[in-house]
Design a protein with these regions (language model features):
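Signature of extracytoplasmic/envelope-associated structural regions
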Residues: 1-318
Length: 318
């Protein structure tokens, strides 16, 4: 019964130590969950034999992968963190939420790779269930806002595999209660780029993290790696909008000079269900252009470039 899916996650007190997430307190509401229960590197034994046939192999460096999405909304109370921020983003190089009249989710910029998660999941029910458990999970996250849809976050994580999947059922979960997500539209969403209210089609923000399995004798860990010489975190994304008349707003000077500009996105109007993100460090890349319903559209990539630790993005719920 593939329609039965249970997902639990909990922040670990120390890396790789099983936090034992419980169905009563640590369940998540997710969609499009696509686990890879086991992943390995494969080493072939290069032995000579007196007959033809496949060489024996050894599966090494065991890990587990989880891809899933969550709806992007508040917790229902302005001063209460949303679980996607207090739990899931902790595995994405974020610190613990700062709680005041609203909640701020700060970027972590220390010398290590930040907090980690114990992640449990169950696919199927009685007779065909599979329980998966990973420790030390870290992950990337991509925020998606598209006009006419609800906003959501896509997570892609890797955890250390200490025990293989089994047929032990997870208890019936107590799911968190939070407001329904609201449509991205003119009534619920405001977006400005360099203080100008663009006619926005979509906005994505990718944390640019690359979770990677690292294995040595006496040490296994999921780290944030990079294969292009950049930092562990490289926040980037895409803005798709109607190109404004250049007399009203001309972005080409900022693009030409790689000049940082400000961005603000506020989604939601009801207290407890407002999500906002802002940056003064947004650098636009080279745009591409298309037409939509006889209107000129611009798709422009961007990068958030900090000039101090963790100051490239402010993420809040209120």
């Amino acid at each position: 019964m593939l329609d039965i899916n249970i997902v639990l996650a909990k922040v670990e007190s120390s890396y790789g130590t099983d936090a034992a997430p419980a169905a009563a307190t640590d369940a998540l509401i997710v969609f499009d969950w696509t686990p890879q229960p086991v992943q390995y590197d494969t080493v072939q034994r290069r032995i000579d034999r007196g007959f033809a046939g496949a060489r024996p192999t050894l599966n090494t460096r065991p890990r587990q992968q989880h891809g899933f999405s969550v709806e992007l909304c508040g917790s229902g109370t302005a001063a209460t963190p949303a679980k996607w921020g207090s739990v899931l983003l902790r595995g994405c190089l974020f610190g613990a939420p700062n709680i005041a009249a609203d909640v701020t989710y700060p970027l972590a910029s220390g010398g290590d790779d930040g907090a980690s998660l114990s992640f449990y999941g169950q696919k199927g029910g009685t007779g065909d269930l599979m329980r998966m458990r990973a420790q030390g999970q870290r992950q990337n996250a991509v925020f998606n806002f598209e006009e006419g849809n609800f906003p959501y976050i896509v997570f892609d994580g890797i955890g250390v595999l200490n025990v293989v999947p089994d047929a032990t059922a997870i208890s019936a979960p107590t799911l968190p209660v939070y407001p329904d997500p609201v449509e991205v539209n003119s009534a619920n969403t405001t977006f400005t780029l360099d203080s100008y209210a663009l006619k926005l089609r979509s906005f994505t923000l990718d944390l640019g993290l690359r979770p990677t399995y690292r294995s040595l004798v006496n040490h296994r860990e999921i780290i944030f790696d990079s294969d292009d010489g950049s930092d562990r975190r490289n926040i980037n994304g895409q803005i798709v909008c109607e190109l404004p008349g250049l007399a009203a707003k001309n972005y080409f000077s900022a693009i030409h000079g790689s000049t940082p500009i400000a961005m603000s996105l506020v989604h939601g109007t009801a207290a407890g269900n407002i999500v906002s993100m802002a940056s003064s460090k947004l650098v636009l890349g080279a745009p591409t252009f298309s037409t939509e319903q006889r209107r000129y559209m611009m798709s422009v990539p961007y990068t958030l470039v900090p000039d101090a630790a963790g100051n490239e993005l402010t993420l809040k719920t209120a």
